[in-house]
């Protein structure tokens, strides 16, 4: 899939398939024909080791992405072999901290691809709780950057929309009543999704036990390997913003709710907020997570 050198463009076009190097070289030629400066940004993939700072070697290079210069002061990056990518939405394995743009007239330069693009999931849930413990409502979500790429990939690998909805229901432990998406097939950085759902919670005597975070951000710890190699490296920068509005059933009151929390790492790179409020029969949860 990933390569540094290309076959003949005629051969690639005839076969209709090729490595990312094959397709990226064709893209560079097309952009230059259109008058848009474009150059290879060569690198060592993240899973193949870091390029040595003191003695960088061509033997350590194993692939490249396309650096596009739409203006004199702007660079954007694209790997044209990715079906669900976009400008500055690269496979995480290519988001290296050290790549070399190969440009003429002494304009070559070192660049970091670690923080290119914006990756954001913004979701709003409006739902009501019945006396039987059934939460019924809608979830509106905007997926941006890597989140949009992942959603498109999930849809593409499903057999059809029914299978996609079935997997969503299984993952979130809900019944999907309606599913609507916009922008899934567009070359754009975001996808909009609307889900109408039902979710059953536990009812015991006169109590209903509801997790106000109806759709979990993380369902299990990512740090469960028996061995861990340092340093720990996250795939990309990340932002999640969730707002949940729940209406409690008539005749019920909130007996107990989670405490507000604000957690932050010592270097400020990771921040999580959990703020829950109540006004009459309305419970509102605002959850945010940021990884820089």
Which residues does each predicted region cover?
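A sensor for short, sequence-defined functional sites
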Residues: 1-292
């Amino acid at each position: 899939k990933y390569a540094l050198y290309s076959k003949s463009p005629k051969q690639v076009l005839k076969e209709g398939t090729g490595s990312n190097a094959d397709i990226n070289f064709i893209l560079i030629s097309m952009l230059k024909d259109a008058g848009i400066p474009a150059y290879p940004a060569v690198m060592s993939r993240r899973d193949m080791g870091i390029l040595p700072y003191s003695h960088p070697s061509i033997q350590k290079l194993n692939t490249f992405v396309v650096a596009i210069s739409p203006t004199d002061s702007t660079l954007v990056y694209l790997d044209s072999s990715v079906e669900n990518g976009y400008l500055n939405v690269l496979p995480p394995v290519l988001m290296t901290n050290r790549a070399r743009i190969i440009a003429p007239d002494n304009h070559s330069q070192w660049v970091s691809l670690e923080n290119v693009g914006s990756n954001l999931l913004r979701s709003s849930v409006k739902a009501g709780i019945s006396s039987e413990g059934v939460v019924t409502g809608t979830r509106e979500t905007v997926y941006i950057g890597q989140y949009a790429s992942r959603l498109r990939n999930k849809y593409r690998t499903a057999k059809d929309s029914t299978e996609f909805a079935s997997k969503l229901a299984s993952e979130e432990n809900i019944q999907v009543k309606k599913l609507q998406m916009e922008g899934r097939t567009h070359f754009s950085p975001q996808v909009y999704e609307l889900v109408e759902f039902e979710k059953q919670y536990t009812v015991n005597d006169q109590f209903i036990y509801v997790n106000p975070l109806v759709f979990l951000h993380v369902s299990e710890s990512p740090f469960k390997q028996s061995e861990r190699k340092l340093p720990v490296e996250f795939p990309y920068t990340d932002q999640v913003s969730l707002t949940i509005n729940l209406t409690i059933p008539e005749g019920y009151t909130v007996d107990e709710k989670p405490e507000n929390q604000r957690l932050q790492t010592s270097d400020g790179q990771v921040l999580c907020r959990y703020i829950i409020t109540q006004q009459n029969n309305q419970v509102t949860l605002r959850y945010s997570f940021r990884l820089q």
